[in-house]
Amino acid sequence: EATRLKENVFYQRAYADYRGRFYLPSFSYAGSDLNRAIVEFADGVPMTQEGWDYLMLHTANVYGDNADFEEKISTSKSRLSLYLQVSNDPVGSFEIWSKADKPFCFLRACCEVRNIIRTCKNGDKFEFERFVSHLPCELDQSNSAYQHISLIMNDEELGKLSNLQGEYSDLYKTVADKLHCPAEKWEKRKIVKNVAVPWGYGASDVTIIRQLREWKNNENKAQYLRSLNWEELSELVTEVRRVIESIAPTVAKFRKEVSVVIGKRLGKGASELIWQTPMMFEVHQRFMKIKKLKAKVFSGHDIVELRAERPINEVEKRKHRSATAPNIVHSFDAAVVHSLLWNASYSGGTGNTQVSRTPLSFPVVTIHDAFSAHAPNLPELRSKLLKVIGGLYTHFDPFNNWLMLVGGEQQSRQISSDWIEKSKNAFS
């Protein structure tokens, strides 16, 4: 069946949740590592010298490198013999590529490198235009939740930690270096990432522990975690969270500021929060208490228990307080995607912003804070992303707008985008 369907063009539906975040079906580029490795663009683009550099960046990323943008490209170019070894003998080199951060994507990238070399190498030169690439190559937003919070709160120090400006910063390594757990350095950093990412978006300790329990089943990537029970995992998550809070106190400050506003709003009888993102997506946040229903019925063979949940007319205030700050970040995160796909450009100042659009000239796959395009199109994509996130905050001040819409006390933060557009590691 796979052979029959090979190279057939297909389209995938996407839907937006109530915050504006896009989701694709389970079998899609947004799916597993294997899914992502086998889905390609239907139309190809001729390779370029700059596109080759971005393919090197993509290959380094899926291999698992964590370094400065230019350093990753340079290191990746020094590994060409390894990439050829993997692509020429995937079975014999299984021990190499199976330990990559994204094994199947790494294998696919190695095959792309091999095919380009075979097609384009002419003596000591490369004639890149001879190769037509269909491979989606990815740019990830570095520490996206922390970037948004740094912009919301106008905190340049958090901006530096999350790679919005200055030299390369590895937030996860910075936290990992302060932990006392005896895990290997690479695993310690991975543990921190698996805590910091969901925590940045507002996940509870219990949710994070459950996710860690799933991840620790990976024998190659969680050797230390596999030795921990629930209580020990809980202690580890608490330690990681406290270190993050100590070096990024603005995150807790932002959540507290939002919680105070929500408390006042709920105290006045509100049952729903409504706000618009800069791209005019209207968020409706409504949390009601749930009545759980159970009933036992005969299925024809056995007695089975049916369970259902029905909302009742009582506001779930605790959920509003805990979920609003993360949902603000999620909605602003979604606005970056909407603005990019709309290819928006802005003029005017805060409160008097004009938005115009032109058709995007190349295909893009978006998965929340990850953006994929043909390698030759990544330089333009990267430039657009930096302008988008800079423009959203300097032309709109979306958090101030949120405060106005929900009845909070507005604060002018005078956010400058100069340092954002100069960043080379915000998307890499």
Language-model regions: role of each:
Residues 1-428:
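Conserved catalytic core of nucleotide polymerization and phosphodiester-bond processing enzymes
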